[in-house]
Regions:
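Active-site acidic short loop of glycosyltransferases
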Residues: 2, 73-76
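Cell-envelope/extracellular polymer assembly enzymes that use nucleotide-activated donors
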Residues: 4-6
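Short, well-formed alpha-helical segments that are part of the catalytic scaffolds
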Residues: 8-28
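Acidic helix N-cap motif at the loop->helix transition within catalytic regions
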Residues: 19, 41-50, 90
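A conserved acidic beta->alpha catalytic loop
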Residues: 24, 36-45, 82
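Short beta-strand/loop segment that forms part of the nucleotide-sugar
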Residues: 30-38, 55, 83
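Conserved donor nucleotide-binding strand/loop of the catalytic core
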Residues: 44-74
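Catalytic-site signature of metal-activated, phosphate-bearing donor transferases
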Residues: 64-70, 77, 88-261
């Protein structure tokens, strides 16, 4: 029996990953909302096997797309997933139990953070490694009390009353299949870097290119050691290097935008 909660996903050309995401929520809900930005690789056709609630919307930024998606949901309890994130069996049960116990959210709980754990490869179907890079982020919430902010880059969930982005943590995990290939990884880093740089310049933030050059080794150590990319072996080493290069690239693009902003 499906529960009074909605799942919504924003996507673009995700035919190779969306299927396993949708499979992971089968039986959890009767309301799966897909917001597609113009896929031409079969993503929409794949999604239609799981839901008829598929909406086209030209890309306007991560936060704005999610604001649009949550408004389309039928229920107040909402689980947001990216198109490369798989719900673990433990999280499936945890969310099911929570909604079944209090379907109308009588305690007015705004939301919960979920551990999003990185999986090294799209082709690795095992659960994420114990020490794999993990990021806690708000994903399961009551849209009356929490929601996403309009941003071209960031998609942080926030409490509508207090503005806080901190929520209680659930025990279950989301498995994050973020990298299809190294080529895909570089393309993704380039896209994020340009979007972030544009947002910085629009907000009046000046680039700090010299400082970033000097700090690049520290950025690498942060990703490789503190964020535990070492747990992914040689692939983690390459990812840490790429993320460090992306940080420098972001400042370089911002410097160009800042230099040419009045031309």
């Amino acid at each position: 029996m499906s529960l009074p909660l909605s799942v919504f996903i924003i996507c673009y050309n995700e035919v190779d990953r969306l299927g396993m995401v949708l499979e992971s929520v089968v039986g959890l809900t009767d309301d799966i909302v897909i917001v597609d930005s113009g896929s031409d690789d079969g993503t929409v056709e794949l999604a239609s096997k799981y839901t008829d609630r598929i909406f086209h919307r030209d890309w306007t930024g991560f936060g704005d797309q999610k604001v649009y998606g949550e408004k389309l949901c039928k229920y107040n309890w909402v689980l947001n997933l990216d198109a490369d994130e798989v719900v673990s069996p433990k999280l499936f049960k945890e969310i099911s139990d929570l909604v079944r116990r209090d379907p109308k959210n009588s305690e007015n709980q705004a939301g919960f953070e979920v551990a999003v754990k990185m999986v090294a490869s799209l082709y690795d179907r095992r659960p994420a490694r114990w020490l794999a890079p993990t990021n806690y982020t708000g994903r399961f919430y009551d849209r009356r009390y929490a929601g996403f902010a309009d941003s071209s880059v960031h998609d942080k969930l926030h409490n509508r009353e207090s503005g806080s982005v901190k929520f209680p943590k659930l025990q279950g995990e989301i498995y994050h299949y973020s990298i299809k290939s190294y080529e895909h990884m570089w393309s993704k880093i380039g896209f994020y870097s340009e979007a972030q740089a544009r947002e910085w310049v629009m907000k009046g933030r000046k680039p700090r290119l010299g400082l970033v050059y000097l700090a690049a080794p520290l950025f690498f150590m942060k990703h490789f050691l503190l964020r535990r990319l070492f747990a992914l072996g040689s692939r983690g080493f390459v990812i840490a290097l790429a993320l460090t290069a992306g940080r420098v690239l972001r400042e370089a693009i911002a410097a160009d935008f800042y230099k040419n902003r009045d031309q």
